[in-house]
Swiss-Prot record:
Name of protein: Caveolin-2
Role summary: May act as a scaffolding protein within caveolar membranes. Interacts directly with G-protein alpha subunits and can functionally regulate their activity. Acts as an accessory protein in conjunction with CAV1 in targeting to lipid rafts and driving caveolae formation. The Ser-36 phosphorylated form has a role in modulating mitosis in endothelial cells. Positive regulator of cellular mitogenesis of the MAPK signaling pathway. Required for the insulin-stimulated nuclear translocation and activation of MAPK1 and STAT3, and the subsequent regulation of cell cycle progression.
Chain positions with Phosphotyrosine modification: 19, 27
Single GO molecular function: D1 dopamine receptor binding
Organism: Chlorocebus aethiops
GO biological process: caveola assembly; endoplasmic reticulum organization; insulin receptor signaling pathway; mitochondrion organization; negative regulation of endothelial cell proliferation; positive regulation of dopamine receptor signaling pathway; regulation of cytosolic calcium ion concentration; skeletal muscle fiber development
InterPro entries per the UniProt record, alphabetical: Caveolin, Caveolin_CS
Length: 162
């Protein structure tokens, strides 16, 4: 959320004589604006959101609309996407950033002061519990399972077809 100082370098050409199959938009070199500010998405978390008009609206070769319709709809798409994003960020960015900050601070506090001490306590007590559990298993459960196994090992079934 910084102050936008550069202007978008997009030009829209609508010649009556040229009927080309491209959109007519010419974009500036990305290297021109690469050093103008900091990278706001250094870990590329939102790289999937970089979509353009051709990613949303596509006309096959056999069904083309008029070039002026295509160019105007492309321009309207880009302008409305730009304006709506700016409008929504003006009203939603600060409150959502505040809410996200509170949420992450709360989760960090719970993780640091409640969850990790509980996990460390469980890991500290676990060897003692493991020793006691092995003793209980060896004294009570193993003989019971052994005797039940021996009892059922002598059972035999015979099926007769009558």
């Amino acid at each position: 959320m910084g102050l936008e100082t550069e202007k978008a370098d997009v030009q829209l050409f609508m010649d009556d004589d040229s009927y080309s199959h491209h959109s007519g938009l010419e974009y500036a070199d990305p290297e021109k604006f690469a050093d103008s500010g900091q990278d706001r998405d250094p870990h590329r978390l939102n790289s999937h959101l970089k979509l353009g008009f051709e990613d949303v609206i596509a006309e096959p070769v056999t069904t083309h609309s008029f070039d002026k319709v295509w160019i105007c709809s492309h321009a309207l798409f880009e302008i409305s996407k730009y304006v709506m994003y700016k409008f929504l960020t003006v009203f939603l960015a600060i409150p959502l950033a505040f809410i996200a900050g509170i949420l992450f601070a709360t989760l960090s506090c719970l993780h640091i002061w409640i969850l990790m001490p509980f996990v460390k306590t469980c890991l500290m007590v676990l060897p003692s519990v493991q020793t006691i559990w092995k003793s209980v298993t060896d004294v009570f459960i193993a003989p019971l399972c052994t005797s039940v196994g021996r009892s059922f090992s002598s059972v035999s079934l015979q099926l007769s077809q009558d």
